[in-house]
């Protein structure tokens, strides 16, 4: 068979052009018996690692080859060409070429290249030039210029596109080749692996050009021929040009480069003179241990762990990595930025002694092999969280220290999910906006799954309509396709040499940031190390709370500012509060499921919080671990563990591993330990088990470990049924298994945030509000909870408020929470600064403010809408009328003062008072909360007439009782572990109620569940022994119209009819619920 290499294959990383995944192209090319394939996406190398990973499995059994290249498109008229680097040095030059083009482009994601960029590099590549579709007078000269720049390395691409004039077109291209003295090379210029993908490629093309498939015309491919074809078919097509087929082998002959050649070198860290990196790390670790435990009081266990870890770190030469993370964390702390390491790094006593993590190895039994293992060739991965509002300072420090040639953020591939796929396919097929929106709304959240026929019918559409069917089919295929690249949340790659010679780097949309073209899985595949500089809103909240305590209560805690390490521990009041499920706003335990679990688990010590964090996760739930643990914890079920045969090990072998979790494996580390102790896995095999657990839903590889583990346990004397049950529990972890070290790191913040809520509720509420957006709950729920805990909350006021929510002393309360201007939707920080700067004397009237401030009328209107003129003895309606009478913004200052003076002398018009209900709705519309009441209290009379109870009555209701309730939806949840069950949290003037919606009810009332702001529910009370109450829904009604009516009455009084459609109150009556999936 004649060898044929397809050297111009574009994957779907040629965004909105290629219609196949890189893996599909490689797999199909091998199945068709091609000799090899070249992946060449347009101005990017983003998809090559995925192709490489697929090819690695194939090459073991055949001589099939993969070539890493790129299709270059130029902005100066140079024809397109595919280029392939011959060796590692040439590959580095290709990366730098693309990096230069990306930084030159003004728009993120584009790459602007010119011929001059390639000219001095051309001799390092194999180049295939693509002729233009139409005659271009200067193409022959261009081709000759390219050929002269890289003698012997340039070919002219020849295709047979089945467009009716292939013969004549081929003759024209052959003449060009002869004139320039370059050979022809055959290619099918592939856009997809199989002809079935042609319709999807049409959709992608229409989306790229912002048109529809029906209006795209010649922008679309004329047929479905641009797919991978077998060698015999290519030989037939090019029978008149056999030399073009043979040329594919000549083209690839000099190419030796593969991604396996990329060798990572971690940057050298500065160390004190006379020391090695190993000595410097050794000194820092022991100094940290002395600080934590006392110089002569380091426990022997800790000493042994330190020596063990340092020896392994030295053996693997990872010292620079630890020194880098130590330096970043130290810099943050010097700047007063809270930070804490988490994840598998919390298994390391070295990380604890360096101050990177907060998990004390004497509190938690660590498994260092979960973090670093000599047997597996994986770099360590340390995740460090920083305050989310100050994380950027840390990131810029990293850029400054390592330079932008050697440091960049990892990419995130933004892929199509169900909703985005439906929207783009709908637009491309010309569906109306309302039909496309209806289809998209059949999908919950950001689902990556399919689209249910029943949901389509519920949306008022016909699932048997051919156009709807076509749209659904194409959308399902499109799900998972890359849409574009973005930056990772904070993962940095740092290198000793130029990073832009390993992977192209481009500018991020965010100023002063740059990111590489590969995501975290790609860099794992090629062996690049990553430092994660992540953000966590709760750290911001805690730091702001510490600042407020130090500012307003300096006499406490010895006058010292609190830190993450200095907070009082073992506080019974904190655990008593959590046992009641009183955890709104508390880190990691504020969800509905966690609030329900707290009274059942009843935490009494720190390790209970570690379990609390981990147990309400899909892994333990799907592994059927939750109920056995709770039964054993409460003494309802004995905790008995089998033993191996006496000759194989101690009787308490499993007790040592599972004793603290009542015989139930809750953590990945326990699963690894069971494999190592009970089945005698090596550390490397145990890590393979961990990886199989993490990926079995995608890869299905965990079954390969099943026989080995079960047989290993049986051979050591364990009962086979027990071994099988044990493995099934571990398998239930799936991709959701939670590391104990990670849970311990988070439990640290659970305790701290709970302590703040327990002892300083006004401080905690202010810090939470000042750290938004974060967490499960909106400002209205945070303020309601604070008031229930005895906090006095004061409204936004022009004479007292700051940008942030602050604490202020009042005659009858030591500290009250004053709402800040940040709570007013649309009011800017700049306007706040102007308002505060001129507030040495109180503002007396709106006209006085207008005279003194250079705020535009919009700012005054926002303040009036928010009822922020209370200290001026003027309410919302009067303030809005006063603002309307102010001079126009264009009035010159001299005349503005005169006009304001005149206005101030006019008597105020007596206006009818706003109804209390109108005030409440207006509060929600402007500040997202109200201190004057709740919308439901103004609907209560009508609801009571219907027999609708309050949320408080539901909480007090007897088990099994049927009740009706209505409330504003604040949270929607559909956890992946809940098997289709949906949970709602609703709120009225008396509190909250928790609603459970079973899948069969969800099918009937899907639209109401997904879209209602105010919802009416009939159902039956379900009360647990621990007092956790749910209302199990049977019927639901959307009553949102009642809220709109309450808002509309006031809007009609103040706004001309022609403006009604544009008024913000018609956009949102109540804040959106917070939905979690």
Swiss-Prot record:
Swiss-Prot/TrEMBL keywords: Cytoplasm, DNA damage, DNA repair, DNA replication, DNA-directed DNA polymerase, Nucleotidyltransferase, Transferase
Main location: cytoplasm
Catalysed transformations (reactions): DNA(n) + a 2'-deoxyribonucleoside 5'-triphosphate = DNA(n+1) + diphosphate
Any single GO BP term: DNA replication
UniProt-recorded Gene Ontology molecular function terms: 3'-5' exonuclease activity; DNA-directed DNA polymerase activity; nucleic acid binding
One term under GO cellular component: cytoplasm
EC number: 2.7.7.7
Keyword Nucleotidyltransferase part of the UniProt annotation: yes
Keyword Nucleotidyltransferase in record: yes
CDD domains per UniProt: DnaE_OBF, PHP_PolIIIA_DnaE2
Name of the top EC class for this enzyme: transferase
Cell compartments where the protein resides: Cytoplasm
Superkingdom, natural source: Bacteria
Pfam families cross-referenced by the UniProt entry: DNA_pol3_alpha, DNA_pol3_finger, HHH_6, PHP, tRNA_anti-codon
Function per UniProt: DNA polymerase involved in damage-induced mutagenesis and translesion synthesis (TLS). It is not the major replicative DNA polymerase.
PANTHER family according to UniProt: DNA POLYMERASE III SUBUNIT ALPHA (PTHR32294), ERROR-PRONE DNA POLYMERASE (PTHR32294:SF4)
Family: Belongs to the DNA polymerase type-C family. DnaE2 subfamily.
Protein name: Error-prone DNA polymerase
Source organism of this protein record: Brucella abortus biovar 1 (strain 9-941)
